[in-house]
A protein has these predicted regions:
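Short acidic/glycine- and proline-prone juxtamembrane loop motifs at membrane-interface regions
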Residues: 90-104
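Loop-to-helix entry region of an early transmembrane alpha helix in multi-pass inner-membrane enzymes
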Residues: 29-33, 42-62, 94-98
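Short helix- or helix-capping micro-motifs
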Residues: 78-89, 134, 138, 152
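Membrane-interface transmembrane helices that cradle and orient dolichyl/undecaprenyl
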Residues: 69-72, 111-127
Length: 170
């Protein structure tokens, strides 16, 4: 349908998705795994591949909505916050690019939602899910280590958060 093609990094990620592995030269494997599954379902056409980041951005927007609700926003303002994310220039322009940042942002946001739930409810299930989602974050981009460092700083500075984590039986 079009003469457009993937950018260099996007083509590299797509090639990785054709040869799945446990890791690649400079990146963890999760984006390639997701693209491989996505391509298997929807094909390898340019239009199909370019809709992948759009779908992920809508999941990120929903995670932002849930994060805002956990931060005590009302539903209307949480929806506005999620919508604002979709229309800010950085997000709206990058929503057409296949990159490791997509999945990192998704799992980072979900991790924040789960962290708030752990602090508020001290739920073992949410604590387990937080670890799982953080693991997915690390499999999407190594920069997820900064979430863990921020979490350690939070636990050091905020006694309530530390108490919630310490009291968790997991």
């Amino acid at each position: 349908f079009t003469d457009f093609s993937l950018y260099g990094d996007e083509a590299q990620y797509w090639l990785w998705s054709q040869n799945l592995d446990l890791g690649y030269y400079s990146k963890p494997p999760l984006l390639a795994w997701f693209l491989g599954g996505y391509s298997g379902l929807f094909g390898d056409s340019f239009i199909s591949l370019k809709t992948f980041p759009l779908i992920v951005y809508f999941f990120i927007s929903y995670a932002i909505y849930k994060l805002c609700l956990n931060l005590s926003f009302d539903k209307k303002n949480a929806k506005l916050c999620a919508l604002n994310f979709l229309i800010i220039p950085a997000a709206s322009l990058s929503s057409f690019l296949i990159s490791t940042d997509l999945l990192l942002l998704l799992f980072w946001t979900i991790s924040m939602v789960l962290l708030l739930k752990v602090i508020k409810t001290n739920s073992t299930l949410n604590f387990f899910l937080l670890g799982l989602v953080l693991g997915l974050g690390f499999l999407s981009k190594y920069a997820a280590i900064y979430f863990l460092l921020s979490l350690l700083l939070l636990l050091f500075l905020d006694r309530t958060s530390l108490k919630s984590v310490r009291n968790n039986p997991l």
